């Protein structure tokens, strides 16, 4: 919205987005540097000790590979933690939108319910529908993935099947059976974070425009 003053709500949405963007980039670089460092040391060790006893070389290489596995594991875990933080940001800002625009009644049980409540409020009050893109990606796929990470397992079989289907449809994760999911790389986190920002700003812009008319 051109010329719009930056409200406290918009400041929260944008500032927390910037913080999360920095964390996603910084943590990725940190662990990738560690992985690259180990790989360089392995290559150098193999070159220097090419003619040494095989058992001795293999023993030392196992130490390098163990260090590499630790880095990889931490990288995977950090993506999972950041993903859950991004979804928590999404839910928190939806709550802030509901409070800021006095949206009542509104089921605040989860992100999906909150967005549905905001859209219903908008339709009932302003007789106009909100057009929001990528809701299935965030409110279905990412919501189920967050629940899987938080609880370690989705107890409902239909939800497990749905998550598998969304993973194949949208990508960004690999899974083994339906009990273990892993975020492939940081590009998925960037996509989720940008999509969340788009949804939040779309809601905020539409509500602010109607309130100011």
Pin down the residues of each PLM region.
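Short, mixed-charge amphipathic alpha-helical segments
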Residues: 120-162
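Short, hydrophobic, well-ordered secondary-structure elements
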Residues: 76-98, 143, 150
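Short coil/turn linker and secondary-structure boundary residues
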Residues: 106-109, 113, 130-134, 184
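Short acidic alpha-helical/loop segments enriched in Asp/Glu that coordinate divalent cations
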Residues: 95-118, 158-163
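Residue-identity detector for glycine
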Residues: 3, 88, 117, 152, ...
